[in-house]
């Protein structure tokens, strides 16, 4: 099998590793090289900046039989693996011409976790030592990676992640019974956390959940997410909507709506950037977030006693609770308040954000320019779930 054939197999398979967003541009290219576009995604470097990365599997061979995974050993699919030299031949020219600024590398369990992780680290070590590559590397560790390989990864990578896939041991047992929650997932993450506290792994730790594969609720996911941020010092948790794959035990399960993935991302932002506590989130009786409203707006509609807030007097925490205002627009408000008062809606034009939404929850110098509570509730009750939102508040 030549290198292009391998890449045509391994690059599309890596799309299941979630990143910040997709950066590839669609081009009218021959079908044989379409993998090149799908290989470019985004990740976050040590300084928190988004950068384009080359996303690739070193091998799609796997000894495990996870119920949701297209790479499971029971699937009859083309298999391929790259050598360290082949990885260098593919990756480094793209760095040199500016197409990418980093590497996101993962692998299937090709042999066993220790052997497969070792091969991946050998490839990165070759990039670092033989070829002098000093740029960004995000390594996806395998469950059950041994302590020595975690230490080695901490010395080689800017970011390390290990996918939990499910929020609890009970949920994991439904979709991946070969993995032990504590031994194979939490213990390696704890070791990686300890290394990150020494100053290694500058871009931090991350993980990913497959949303909807194990029958978990949004509350299940976000309770665990909160714990991961607090106790294991994760920098980021990603959510990927479950998609059924032919030939797997879950092939007949309905796909998870992408809007659910979006709502979880929005709730994650509330936890990380807006000062919300997990228990404040607007769950329904089944522990799920509403699909037709983003969680910040749903929370605000459920708490009319908190609104409207006076834009000229509210502190930062109060302003961050206002639908339509985010950290950037709130910082502008606080800065502009030192120069004068907000009196009319057109004074908000310089702020950015979803100002039409914010009007329903603020007063300007004591005057309210939004809809009354009944009209506001009626307006939002008519909304239908959307597949994607272009902006976060």
Language-model features, listed with the residues they occupy:
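Conserved, mostly hydrophobic/aromatic
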Residues: 53, 66, 105, 162, ...
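Flexible, acidic/Gly-rich N-terminal and inter-domain linker regions that tether
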Residues: 1-64, 354-355, 362-363, 367-384, ...
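Core AdoMet radical
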Residues: 72-87, 94-120, 126-148, 154-199, ...
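Conserved C-terminal portion of the radical SAM core fold
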Residues: 159, 164, 168, 183-249, ...
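C-terminal extensions
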Residues: 289-318, 345-393
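Canonical Radical SAM [4Fe-4S] cluster-binding loop centered on the CxxxCxxC motif
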Residues: 48, 56-85
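Residue-level signature of tetratricopeptide-repeat
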Residues: 336-337
């Amino acid at each position: 099998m030549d290198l292009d054939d391998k890449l045509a197999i391994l690059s599309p398979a890596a799309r299941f590793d979630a990143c910040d967003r997709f950066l590839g541009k669609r081009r009218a290219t021959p079908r044989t090289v379409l993998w090149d576009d799908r290989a470019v995604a985004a990740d976050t470097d040590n300084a928190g900046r988004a950068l384009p990365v080359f996303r690739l599997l070193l091998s799609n061979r796997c000894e495990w039989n996870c119920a949701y995974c297209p790479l499971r050993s029971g699937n009859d699919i083309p298999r391929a693996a790259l050598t360290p030299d082949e990885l260098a031949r593919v990756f480094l020219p793209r760095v040199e011409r500016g197409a990418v600024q980093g590497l996101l590398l993962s692998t299937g369990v090709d042999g066993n976790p220790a052997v497969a992780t070792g091969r991946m680290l050998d490839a990165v070590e070759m990039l670092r030592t033989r070829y002098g590559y000093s740029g960004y590397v995000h390594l996806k560790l395998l469950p059950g990676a041994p302590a020595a390989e975690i230490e080695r990864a901490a010395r080689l990578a800017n970011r390390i992640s290990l996918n939990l896939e499910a929020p609890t041991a009970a949920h994991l047992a439904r979709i991946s019974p070969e993995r032990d929650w504590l031994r194979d997932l939490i213990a390696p993450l704890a070791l990686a956390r300890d290394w990150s506290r020494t100053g290694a792994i500058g871009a931090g730790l991350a993980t990913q959940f497959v949303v909807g594969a194990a029958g978990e609720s949004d509350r299940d996911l976000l309770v665990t997410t909160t714990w991961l941020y607090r106790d294991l010092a994760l920098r980021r948790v990603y959510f990927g909507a479950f998609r059924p794959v032919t030939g797997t035990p879950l092939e007949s399960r309905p796909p998870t709506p992408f809007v659910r993935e979006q709502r979880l991302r929005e709730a994650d932002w509330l936890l990380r950037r807006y000062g919300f506590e997990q228990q404040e989130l607007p769950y329904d009786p089944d522990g799920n977030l509403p699909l037709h409203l983003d969680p910040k707006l749903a929370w605000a509609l459920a708490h009319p006693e908190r609104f409207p807030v006076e834009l000229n007097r509210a502190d930062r925490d109060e302003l961050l609770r206002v639908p339509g205002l985010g950290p950037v627009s709130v910082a502008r408000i606080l800065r502009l308040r030192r120069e004068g008062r907000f009196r009319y809606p057109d004074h908000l034009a310089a702020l950015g954000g979803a100002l039409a939404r914010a009007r329903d929850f603020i007063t300007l110098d004591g005057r309210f320019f939004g809809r009354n509570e009944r009209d506001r509730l009626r307006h939002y009750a008519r909304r239908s779930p959307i597949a994607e939102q272009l902006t976060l508040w």
